[in-house]
Design a protein with these regions (language model features):
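Conserved C-terminal structural/oligomerization subdomain of aldehyde/semialdehyde dehydrogenase
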Residues: 29-35, 221, 258, 312, ...
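Glycine-rich loop-to-alpha-helix module at the N-terminal edge of alpha/beta enzyme cores
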Residues: 31-122
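Hydrophobic face of amphipathic alpha-helices that form TPR/SEL1-like repeat modules
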Residues: 1-28, 54
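Structural signal for hydrophobic packing residues in well-ordered secondary-structure cores
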Residues: 55, 59, 76-83, 87, ...
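Residue-level signal for inorganic ion chemistry
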Residues: 30, 68, 90, 112, ...
């Protein structure tokens, strides 16, 4: 085991004030990868003081947009230069296949470049108002912002928040997930190497119950951005009321993947597998509910199950691996419990449903691709987010029935539809209560387009210009072009 991985506060690598550490584990084999500093509320307070100084009195608050852009472009170049190392690190810390982490790293660099380019684009507006006045708006950074991300896409989710926050001119306190801190440590080493001023970017590691809670309630953190579970999002929302801080929340999902009878069946089968089993189903937008028109249900399920049984489950660096380890033993047990719940509720288990322990898989936390049919809308496996490789298949009769079933959820993050009839597909999408939608595909995501959901899937948006705006305040400026007395009072 290497030396303790430290936190980054005010341009310095520091241990936790308490001296506590936590081990980071490779979920594929249980190997201890590193010990990392385990911060607390006191470390958050220290980071906030550094961020305040950098924003209000230091160089970052007055750094021109062109210089912010140059630093972000340099950071993107450093990510590219260290892509192999970052992908390997992410694979070992998170457990996902190496080919997935390579995509994540490439997307990370692209996201930094997108927001670097956005820094210098027009942000304000002017308004035609009555003479002799001129009215305009400008966008300004919020100030000190807190960023909290989950463990399923540690590096990429970090970038989705860090890039726009810094591009807009804010100072950040960033908290990675407790289970996957290592790529964040490496990213902050690259932030330091790129030359960002001290205090502009701060890394505090630790538990959500201590570090995350303090960030949410801290009176001098002016915005909190969080990606994670809906219950945690509720707690953050309540804690943020103390100083009425701005919040953006990207939360849970139970997203539908809908296939009409006129779809290209083989293509839809392929996408449906990708929708639920990519990243072991540990995706907030996973297509965990598969809605099939009843006329194609049996044939589609037969093809789907046959393909699912062929998925190669192995450690992330194995040759030809298609699905890898779950993030932790505790999460694996949660997923396995949901599988048992599905059986008890009366759903039919067609494949998977078990922990895989053959050979080297016995050292890690692996679950077979799992498919249930004969489900009903009231079942927990249909309504609750499992966050694993578990698919619930439902039948629908016609377009109206498909819309009804698809929207029968407290969540509204994402959804996809498959049909060769473009009018039918578009009509369905317009009625789907979800923030991210796809037609004849599932999961494509772009830095340029907003990401976020309806209902209990969150508030606000990541990515695109919408994601940038989340980290800004709008200031109205009014100019009198003919200065003189107002003439309101006669005396």
């Amino acid at each position: 085991m290497s030396d303790v991985k430290k936190m980054f506060i005010n341009g310095q690598w520091v241990e936790a004030l308490s001296g506590e550490t936590r081990e980071s584990i490779n979920p594929a084999n249980g190997e201890v990868l590193a010990a990392v500093a385990e911060g607390s509320a006191a470390d958050v307070d220290k980071a906030v003081e550094a961020a305040k100084e950098a924003f209000y009195n230091g160089p970052w608050g007055s750094t021109p947009a062109q210089e912010r852009a140059a630093l972000l472009f340099k950071l993107a170049d450093l990510v590219d230069a260290n892509a192999g190392e970052l992908a390997e690190l992410e694979m070992r810390d998170n457990g996902k296949p190496l080919r997935e982490t390579k995509y994540d790293v490439a997307d990370t660099a692209a996201c930094f470049r997108y927001y670097a380019g956005l820094c210098t684009k027009p942000m304000g507006q002017t308004y035609e108002v009555a003479d002799p006045m001129q009215a305009m708006t400008v966008r300004e950074p919020i100030g000190v912002v807190g960023l909290i991300v989950p463990w399923n896409y540690p590096l990429l989710m970090a970038t989705w928040k860090i890039a726009p926050a810094l591009a807009a001119g804010n100072c950040i306190i960033f908290k990675p997930a407790e289970l996957t801190p290592l790529s964040a440590v490496r990213l902050f080493e690259l932030i330091e190497a790129a030359g960002f001023p001290k205090g502009s970017a701060n890394l505090v590691m630790g538990a959500g119950a201590s570090v995350g809670a303090r960030m949410a309630e801290h009176p001098e953190i002016e915005k909190i951005a969080f990606t994670g579970g809906t219950e945690t999002g509720r707690k953050i929302m309540m804690a943020a009321t103390g100083n009425l801080k701005k919040i953006s929340l990207e939360l849970g999902g139970k997203s539908p993947c809908v296939v009409f009878e006129d779809a290209d069946m083989d293509a839809a089968v392929d996408w449906a597998l990708f929708a639920i089993f990519a990243n072991q189903g540990q995706v907030c937008s996973a297509g965990s509910r598969l809605l099939l028109q009843e006329s194609i249900h049996d044939e589609f399920v037969e093809k789907l199950v046959a393909r699912a049984k062929q998925i190669k489950v192995a450690p992330g660096d194995a040759e030809g691996v298609e699905m890898a380890a779950m993030i932790s033993e505790a999460h694996m047990e949660k997923v396995l419990k949901y599988i048992e719940i599905g059986k008890e509720e009366g759903a039919t288990l067609l494949c998977g449903g078990e922990r895989l322990t053959d050979g080297e898989l016995g050292k890690g936390f692996f679950v077979a691709p799992t498919i249930f049919t004969d489900t009903t809308p009231d079942m927990r496996i249909v309504q609750e987010e499992i966050f694993g490789p578990v698919l619930a298949v439902q039948k629908f009769t016609d377009d109206e029935d498909a819309v009804r079933l698809a929207n029968d959820s407290i969540y509204g993050l994402a959804g996809g539809v498959f049909s060769e009839n473009g009018t039918r597909a578009m009509k369905f999408i317009k009625k789907l209560r979800a923030g991210i939608t796809w037609i004849n595909c599932y999961h494509p995501t772009y830095s340029e387009a907003p990401w976020g959901g309806y209902k209990q899937s969150g508030i606000g948006r990541d990515l695109g210009t919408y994601g940038f705006d989340e980290y800004t305040e709008v200031k109205q400026i009014n100019i009198n072009l003919e200065p003189g007395p107002v003439g309101w009072f006669e005396g």
